[in-house]
From Swiss-Prot:
Protein's organism: Mycoplasma mobile (strain ATCC 43663 / 163K / NCTC 11711)
A GO biological process held by the record: glycogen biosynthetic process
Top-tier EC class: transferase
Record NCBIfam families: glgA
Role of this protein: Synthesizes alpha-1,4-glucan chains using ADP-glucose.
Family: Belongs to the glycosyltransferase 1 family. Bacterial/plant glycogen synthase subfamily.
Catalysed reactions, as listed in the record: [(1->4)-alpha-D-glucosyl](n) + ADP-alpha-D-glucose = [(1->4)-alpha-D-glucosyl](n+1) + ADP + H(+)
CDD domains for the chain: GT5_Glycogen_synthase_DULL1-like
Annotated GO MF terms: alpha-1,4-glucan glucosyltransferase (ADP-glucose donor) activity; alpha-1,4-glucan glucosyltransferase (UDP-glucose donor) activity
This protein's pathway: Glycan biosynthesis; glycogen biosynthesis
InterPro entries named in the record: Glyco_trans_1, GS/SS, Starch_synth_cat_dom
Amino-acid positions noted as binding ADP-alpha-D-glucose in the UniProt annotation, renumbered to this chain: K15
Listed name of the protein: Glycogen synthase
Amino acid sequence: MKILYISVECFPFIKTGGLGDVAYSFPKTLKKLGNDIKVFLIYSDSISEKYKEKMRSAYFFSLDLNGKSFPVEIFSLVMDDIEYLFFNDPSFKNIERTAYLDLHENSTFYLIFNKAISKFLELSAFKPEIIHANDWHTGILPLFLSGEKNENSKLKVVFTIHNLQYQGVFGASNVLKYLNEKERSNSLLSEIISNDIFNFMKAGIISSDIVTTVSETYKEEIKQPMQGMGLESVLNKYNSKLRGIINGLDYDIFNPSIDKYIEAKYDVSNYKEAKLINKIALQKELNLEQNKKIFLIGMISRLANQKGIDLVLNSLWNIVKDNDIQFVVLGTGDVNYESNLKSFGNKYPRNFKFINKFSDELSHKLYAGLDAFLIPSLFEPCGLTQLISLKYGCIPIARATGGLIDTITSYNDKQENANGFLFKEYTPEALYKSVKLAKNLFYNNKPEWNKLIYFGMDQRFGWEEIAKKYLESIYK
């Protein structure tokens, strides 16, 4: 099957969130399963020189829109048998191209990005059967492909919602002025535009053939007002084309048996001694008391409201006050959250450590050395960190939302094959209660604790299983 996969970020070129991991691992797996796939991305000056040096100019053309000419160059790089295509328009050189920007002036940039994809499809000998677009940045693309779909009835556009919070909302006039007559006459525009607002995410939902979300629970949650972010009525209307499939984990990258960053490698058959070695090594590196018996918990997170950082700040004192826990947070984000975490770390250095950066190497060491991993998200479409922590025998303590519900079987509920802890209420008290329950089990019932580790490590959330679901139930 021929597939064009479109994203604004992709590891190792540019990555600001979980989409970057998905856009690397998912196409790689589809390729391994025998599919012909290309990945369409955005060029950025921040891409490492070692990749830029391998790029070649594949296409150069101008897009003439509303009396203005936009020069477009598409670079090509082949890596691991996959061609990566990078859109570049030098007239937008000063725009910071990240997945979470939703700035007014960027409506034109993302419109040109999608127009360039449409033009590429005209020029290229590569004729995909599936176009898989991701998040709001690509939401307008199905409108531009109406002509392609008329000529090629086999062409199907799949649109994936990774995070409904970011929608690409712009003044309609700023978008419409760059559409041609055929595009402006599309009957779907009257439904997409509301109160002179053009919503790219809404456009993707309405105009694509199938809409997927990144977990079954999140699919249901976004049809409700609390998490629908204003689009719940649209999602309910188009419920028949809505699907929920969790993201996978790339075991070539996240696998304690081959992890180059950790002190002692291990798998489900020999984790006990290795995890203690990794724990002591982590404590030493972070200048914490080297104590293999203490309960060591942590977080790796973007410091944003979505991630439940306010709950953590309001629970910290209760969590560490008894001096029987070490707590580590690794992440960057909201400056107020950073400041408060730094302040707490300065007051209680014996029990709490805040590392105000992101480090891929250190994150691997945390997964291998921590006893438990905290994920107190307000909402979590899928979640990647719980999948990694499970693989590394690091017990997740998470709020019951989105993909966390779909991947964590809670010990609280006394379920068989439990692999973690879930709490329902979004309150500091509920978070603390769940941490306390986990701590008590860790200290007082090691056989039960080790069962959680075993069941977590023994589960499979690999991309091959997920890719087969897409091939069998979405793409075909």
